[in-house]
């Protein structure tokens, strides 16, 4: 086991940072040093923000979004289209759609996708409340905004079967050529999806 090069408090900071997605031990050490160097302008404010987040952030019991209120800001927004429900895997997907400005509907966060490999089964996801929400008379369309992975596709099929008894239109995001993309750089699966999802011009 490598010998610690700093005091236990700094080593603990490094170990906690290394648990973050995308940060390994080396990156965590660099991040810790940067935080320590900028103690007044970065470390202190970050620690304060994290304390507030730990105390005030809650999961919306309606959609699964994270916010400082329950129901969340999106669920309380009267300007949102109540007839459309956008199903996403995780909060990060919800945030990405919100940044695009293309969605003015309500969301439902599943909290993951079905995965035989990882042992994720339907009861591990936020599916029961989705079926309840879709059964409401105001909902007329469900948009499946799930990733185009094997697990994402499996989950999309499962969700579709789970809400088949509801009188709603089920759509999913188009897959294919990204804006600004060149065909020569795309993989065969993406090109096949683009051909199948082609639209009139």
From Swiss-Prot:
A UniProt-annotated Pfam family: RecR_C
UniProt GO BP: DNA recombination; DNA repair
Every Toprim domain range: 83-178
Stored SMART domains: TOPRIM
InterPro entries: DNA_Rcmb_RecR, Rcmb_RecR, Rcmb_RecR_Znf, TOPRIM_dom, TOPRIM_RecR
Zinc finger residue extent: C4-type: 60-75
Molecular function in Gene Ontology: DNA binding; zinc ion binding
Keyword GTP-binding listed: no
UniProt superkingdom: Bacteria
The entry's keywords: DNA damage, DNA recombination, DNA repair, Metal-binding, Zinc, Zinc-finger
Similarity comment: Belongs to the RecR family.
NCBIfam families the UniProt entry points to: recR
Function: May play a role in DNA repair. It seems to be involved in an RecBC-independent recombinational process of DNA repair. It may act with RecF and RecO.
HAMAP family named in the record: RecR (MF_00017)
PANTHER family: RECOMBINATION PROTEIN RECR
Protein name per UniProt: Recombination protein RecR
Organism annotation: Methylobacterium radiotolerans (strain ATCC 27329 / DSM 1819 / JCM 2831 / NBRC 15690 / NCIMB 10815 / 0-1)
């Amino acid at each position: 086991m490598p010998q610690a090069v700093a005091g236990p408090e700094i080593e603990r900071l490094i170990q906690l940072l290394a648990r973050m997605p995308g940060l390994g031990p080396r990156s965590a050490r660099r991040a810790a040093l940067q935080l320590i160097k900028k103690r007044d302008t970065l470390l202190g404010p970050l620690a304060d923000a994290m304390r507030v987040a730990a105390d005030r952030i809650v999961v919306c019991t309606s959609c699964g979004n994270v916010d400082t209120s329950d129901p969340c800001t999106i669920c309380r927004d009267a300007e949102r289209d109540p007839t459309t429900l956008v199903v996403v895997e995780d909060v990060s997907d919800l945030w990405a759609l919100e940044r695009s400005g293309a969605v003015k509907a309500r969301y439902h966060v599943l909290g993951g996708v079905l995965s035989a490999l990882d042992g994720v089964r339907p009861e591990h996801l936020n599916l029961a409340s989705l079926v309840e929400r879709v059964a409401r008379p105001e909902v007329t369309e469900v948009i499946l905004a799930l990733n185009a992975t094997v697990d994402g596709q499996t989950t999309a099929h499962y969700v579709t079967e789970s809400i088949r008894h509801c009188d709603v239109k089920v759509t999913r995001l188009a897959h294919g050529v990204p804006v600004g993309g060149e065909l020569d750089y795309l993989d065969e699966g993406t090109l096949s999806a683009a051909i199948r999802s082609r639209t009139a011009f």
